[in-house]
Amino acid sequence: MRTLLILVVAATLLPTTVSAQSDTSWLDRPLAAWSQASGTVPPARAGTESQSALERRCGSSSLTASAAAHAVRNAGWVPFLHFDRVIARDDVEVLGGMTAATSPGCEPTMFNLFVFVGGRFAGTISPIVMGQGRDGVAGAVRVTAADALTAEFARYTTKDAECCPSSRVRVTYRIERAQPTLVPIDLRTLR
């Protein structure tokens, strides 16, 4: 019975792990818009523990009142501040949502970053769920203007240690404000 339980858990988690490692090719192809002007935060895939257990363990009481945190939470994610910092300018806010985290420490291991404009969801900075120490994980995110932001992503090869990606790229996004939508417009290698 115990072996069966282990196999079921492994089979459930394996597709998510493989997907998170192999879908980062979006950084290697010409940029294409993945966010749509639906205003709906994409639903979270199940993590390694329930949303309520992860919320109790890693949730932030300072994120309970914002409209963005409410929308992220309602979609099954646990809201968090990326690098423990508020990322906001004018009415643009970037908020993290996780479905798994390290224990102890609560470092997100399955997450995405959600962009809100005037409290309305505009899109995610990555078309896939990201994981720490994996190719395509987000680093610094900056709101550079009322209609623009940038995000840096680590690029790992199979020979890189988790601490040390081979390179970094920066994606620049335009925010279409009428029906808030996040659109990637440029990708540049930084190193």
What residue spans do the PLM features occupy?
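Exposed acidic/polar residues on beta-strands and adjacent loops within beta-sheet cores, strongest
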Residues: 20-191
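Bacterial N-terminal signal peptides
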Residues: 6-15
